[in-house]
Amino acid sequence: MKKEIYSYNSESLTCNARPILPIMGEFHFSRYPEGEWKTAIKNMQQGGVDIVATYVFWIHHEEAEGEWDFSGRRNLKAFLSCCQEAGMKVWLRIGPWAHGECRNGGFPDWLVEKEKRGKLSLRTDDPQYLKYVDLFFTKIAEQADGYMHKDDGPVIGIQIENEYGHAGGPSDREEGMAHMRTLRAMAEKKGLTAPYFSATGWGGAYVPENFLPVLGGYVDAPWANHTHELAASENFLFQPFHDDANIASDFAEGQSDFTFDTSKFSYLTAELGGGLQVTAHRRTYPYPEDIEAQTICMLGAGANLIGYYMYHGGVNPDGKYTTLQESKATGYANDLPVKSYDFQTCLRENGLPSESYYRLRKHHIFIKNTQELLAPAKVYLPDNISEPASAEDMETLRAAFRYNKTADCGFLFINNHQRKRKMTEKQITPEKPLQFTVTDVEGIQRQMIFDRIHVRTDAILVLPYNLPVVIRGEQFRLRETNASYLGCFGGTYYFYTDEKPEDIYFEWSDGNDHAEAVRILTIHDAEHFCYAQEGADEKGKVSLLPDLHFAEAGKVRIADAGQAVESIWNVYGQTEPNVYELTLEYEYHPADALSGDVWLALDFGTAHACIRTEN
């Protein structure tokens, strides 16, 4: 098998010199039972995720100085092995400071205590601090040995530090840049090398040369130090290279200057909120349409790495000496749940998919099917209508057009949703058209005009323009349609829409009707769409993921007062001697299920049990 060669240019990431647009989802291995990693990875892949990003929290592995723990759910080597077996790429976020709503941002208490006693200075080039970092990186390298990309392993990316220069770090820019370079050199010396080294770039964070800057955005700010409603977020506008000033506003509010040259990099994200983690004082709920709309606004504005934080929730591991969540008691701004890190995200802490999982999934299918056209496509904003006055503007159409000049085609992105607001319904007509002026491959300016689109309140549209198609061996162009594009599978072109059948139109370059090559799905079916192809010459099979159904179980009774069983889930350390029995009647078709589907869940606070499928 030919080794994949990963690189990047100012337009996109590349694999074997071809543009790619990966989907990356955050999942913390040490916050999830090791026996369920394979199921979690498989379900992430089913959702369209190509790369799993994960923190290595220092405190999870060295709570007491010199006492290292890479066993059980903390076993990084075993997790990387699961990823390799599943064909899932990995982006390791090795810190040494991570945040991630972890105690001390991931620093062990003993290390923090050394700074308090004046023994060292954290997050600097202080030799005493670097001595401990060197050992931490050594331990990570031992775990990752054989799993780096150079060894044909799954690790293709490494993130150094987190929010450095925004949430902590020196105010002196050169000093901060130097420290980032120091950490990278230390990691590489240990064998922690990868095609991509990244650094978070929002809020003025330090991004030296030879680092990829990654950005993010959240639909709300549970870390904000107040409980009043936020102003309408600009994350729901199409803004190329957008910097969400609300990220980490608990550390430094309002910083949004870049320390890197945006012309040298494509727009990459690592922290698009797949949900929101609750805090004690601010328990914000991420509506699924919020998550979908924000993602499409980033994609339409040119994002060429869609990275979610989090994509799969989890549970904080038990600490030997303390609990392991962020808290005010440790000097941080927020109190977080002691155990739950559910994040209200795509795959919840119990492994169940949420509505956001399905809403995003159809866009991931589209991205995978069109990435070679989409990734090099330049972003254009409308030139015949004004930009929205602000995110509170519910009247102005929000749209962006990504045009690939080499292929002479593009995709129109429209978002008519704003969190906790109601946007007006809109009509794009010949009297009120939508116009973009693009520059083609010959340097000539051309107008792209759309004039037959109905935009409902909360609508999110992804419409192809001049799309190259092959039907019965002949090449055509799909000039226009008002149905969102899912992709081409087995020679059939799939679209989805909630418009009435009589209102859907397709305009082909040859003027004919190619209905036999088109399938129009409901939005629901697009979200559940699956295509499996056994071989290159096979037609392939289309199927749908199952919906979640909730049914009331039978009455619970105590069947036996047996012997107590010790478990890590015992509440307050007390064993439970009762054995419970119930009857659950449910029609079950194994072929239709997600691996790891939960068919019965019992939740008693910090104790839980469940029955899962295995396929």
Give short role names for the model-derived ranges.
Residues 590-615:
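Aromatic-lined ligand-binding clefts that engage carbohydrates, nucleic acids, or primary amines
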Residues 37-105, 109-110, 184-189:
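Aromatic-lined substrate-binding rim segments of carbohydrate-active enzymes
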Residues 1-51, 81:
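N-terminal carbohydrate-binding accessory modules
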Residues 23-28, 55, 91-95, 159-161, ...:
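A cross-family glycoside hydrolase active-site/sugar-binding cleft signature
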Residues 118, 129-144, 151-156, 160, ...:
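Carbohydrate-binding surfaces of carbohydrate-active enzymes
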Residues 29-35, 61-62, 66-73, 166-167, ...:
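Acidic-and-aromatic substrate-binding clefts and catalytic sites of carbohydrate-active enzymes
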Residues 55-60, 64-67, 72, 100-128, ...:
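Aromatic- and acidic-residue-enriched carbohydrate-binding clefts of CAZyme catalytic domains
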Residues 85-88, 99-247, 253-278, 297-303:
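Active-site region of glycoside hydrolase catalytic domains
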